[in-house]
Amino acid sequence: MLKSGDRFETFILSIDSIHKCINRIKQDIISDTDLKGVHTLWLYELLKSPTALTAAQLAAKSNIDRSLVSREVKFLIDSGYLSLAEGAKQRGYNTRLQLTERGRDIAEKIALSALAVQESVGGCISADELLVFYDVLLRISDNLEHLSRDGIADVSGRIAAGE
């Protein structure tokens, strides 16, 4: 069993390694396009959404700053991956966006690649283990989000006091 300090190191190094690998995989998937890795999740989200989404919704779903999403959405529209949803008159955070045919084609490639990656890396893990893993991962993510937002002073104080 890992000691507390070893768990911290293992967690940080593993998450960092996973993040780097995911970024390399995203770049590989879109290497024949003019897209950036940050675009992949937005195109995927628009593909799976039954309705058009706003830049604000894409920012919330991807936990990325709205101003970055807004700038990149302009690129995606200008490059022909996205268009304003029917009836939209101007661009803004609340303007609904939809995939163009070009955007749908690459979003489908992203979705197929994501599924292939999941099957490849999860092939040796049982369905029950995956359920537990994702449940624990989501709880850790939520807890870290609260700590990063609210600060760790209270937690650090309790740990130092031996609570």
Regions inferred by a protein language model and the residue ranges of each:
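Charged, amphipathic alpha-helical coiled-coil/dimerization segments
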Residues: K74-D135
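N-terminal leader segment of winged-helix/HTH proteins
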Residues: M1-T33, S79-Y81
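N-terminal helix-turn-helix DNA-binding core of bacterial DNA-binding proteins
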Residues: R24-L68
